[in-house]
């Protein structure tokens, strides 16, 4: 049962109208910006939309509104089911359109793209793997290698993340922000307005690139290791005598730079 007090795109034509108007306004603002590649209309739809009919209808309306003011930028179309179901979204309705899919939490196999490559070839529309990540370095290397072997462009999520080890930049979790998180989870007292403001400003400062911990092994796995088995030193500054941390093993693939029995699959 639809509750009109809550936001729902697919149950409200009024909200769909607002989305169309919003995208037209965005396109008006950025129509001449050459450094913007295009517009990804809706991220990871996950709704019961039989035949993809309503999804396509809304996409077509947004596209038409954008094209009234901007005929230059790419239109990125994500499928249903978190961008992986393109039922009803073919054939294309614009001559500058890309189909965008995502991949998370599943193993990497040689046939992982077999479900979507035929759509690219049959519809003559490029593919874009618009979001992936949250996994091991070996997983990154394997999947990116597969994408590039099949001429599929890609983007990763995310470049910076709080207190994590699977993004290129790790952001330090400050105590004030942890207090906010504890309160949200019902596990702590409510911060004062002043405490919350100070905590968020400290987090914003921690998010600056110069204040993040750079994990060089991740970009190495994503770019260099996709084309070579070569092993290179983790850092040119490490010398003996001196201290070398155990974690600073050489940069390279498993079984070449290091050996680990659990490195990939869907973790």
Model regions and ranges:
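Substrate-binding clefts and catalytic carboxylate motifs of secreted carbohydrate-active enzymes
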Residues: 51, 58, 64-267
């Amino acid at each position: 049962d639809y509750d009109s007090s809550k936001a729902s795109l697919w149950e409200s034509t009024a909200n769909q109208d607002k989305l169309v108007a919003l995208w037209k306004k965005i396109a008006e603002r950025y129509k001449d910006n050459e450094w913007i590649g295009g517009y990804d209309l809706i991220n990871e739809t996950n709704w019961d939309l039989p035949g993809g009919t309503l999804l396509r209808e809304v996409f077509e309306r947004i596209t038409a509104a954008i094209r009234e003011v901007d005929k230059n930028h790419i239109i990125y179309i994500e499928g249903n089911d978190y961008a992986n179901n393109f039922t009803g979204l073919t054939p294309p309705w614009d001559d500058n359109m890309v189909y965008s899919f995502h991949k998370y939490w599943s193993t990497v196999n040689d046939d992982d793209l077999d479900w979507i490559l035929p759509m690219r070839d049959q519809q003559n529309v490029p593919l874009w793997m618009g979001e992936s990540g949250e996994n091991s370095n070996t997983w990154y290397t394997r999947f990116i290698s597969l994408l590039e072997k099949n001429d599929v462009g890609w983007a990763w999520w995310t470049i910076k993340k709080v207190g994590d080890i699977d993004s290129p930049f790790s952001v330090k979790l400050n105590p004030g922000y942890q207090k906010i998180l504890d309160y949200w989870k019902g596990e702590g007292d409510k911060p004062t307005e002043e405490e919350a403001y100070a905590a968020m400003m400290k987090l914003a400062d921690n998010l600056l690139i110069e204040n993040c911990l750079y994990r060089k092994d991740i970009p190495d796995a994503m770019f260099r290791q996709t084309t070579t088995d070569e092993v290179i030193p983790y850092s040119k500054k490490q010398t003996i005598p001196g201290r070398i941390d155990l974690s600073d093993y050489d940069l390279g693939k498993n079984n070449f730079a290091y050996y680990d029995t659990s490195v990939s699959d869907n973790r």
